[in-house]
Amino acid sequence: MKEHFQLKETIVTIVADDQSYIELAKESIAVHRLKLEEYIRSDPYFKVTLEPYECSSDAPEVVKRLVAAGNSVGIGPMSAVAGTIAALAVGSMVDAGATSAIVDNGGDIAFLNDRPIVIGIYAGQSSIRNIGFTLEPSDHIRGICTSSGTVGPSINFGCADAAVVFSDDVSLADSAATELSNATGIGHEGVENAFDTISSIINIDGAVVIQGEHMGMWGTIPQITRADMQYECITKG
């Protein structure tokens, strides 16, 4: 079953086999959003910095994950916020016994799947469309996160229609996708050179960039397949 859920700026699609798991995911989103909001009230700089950040050992788990991801990539902690909220929500479902759980937070997706699934990529006005990836079953939570310089409201300094990163660390995938998108220029060279910004980061499996009519790949990526993308079905803010 699938449910669309919004809490303030957080807009997600939650997929699970039982409604009770979906309710747990919604509770997790509310709890961790509140903890993040409280932390930002105590230090507003955390929300706006585009640079690595240090937090205390008693910071909330959501803050620690954001900081670790941003610091690994070399950018600000809020670069990982969507993926981190998604990962914590999926984690709450898995802890309760779910063997199949997906949270799509505006294109930053955390998932555990006990059957093959296809995740499509929306690349705006690019001529490269209706592509997706087949994700084989796994026994641990994974992430596929997408950032764009042409789609969506997030701060972005690049030209990517879609910069996609795969990692078992969902927060890291989100931060790295942001950095990859920021680094993407125009044309084949602009796409290929962008991968230099993330190629040395540990625990990133692979990445894909779509820019206009150009598409580049780096590392290990899942099998590419056709995915008929319907705009109205995309989780977006």
From Swiss-Prot:
Q: Which NCBIfam families match?
A: PRK04334.1-4
Q: What is this protein called?
A: UPF0280 protein Mbur_0309
Q: Which parts of the chain are coiled coil?
A: none
Tell me the domain of life: Archaea
Q: Which family does it belong to?
A: Belongs to the UPF0280 family.
UniProt cross-references to SUPFAM superfamilies, sorted A to Z:
ApbE-like (SSF143631)
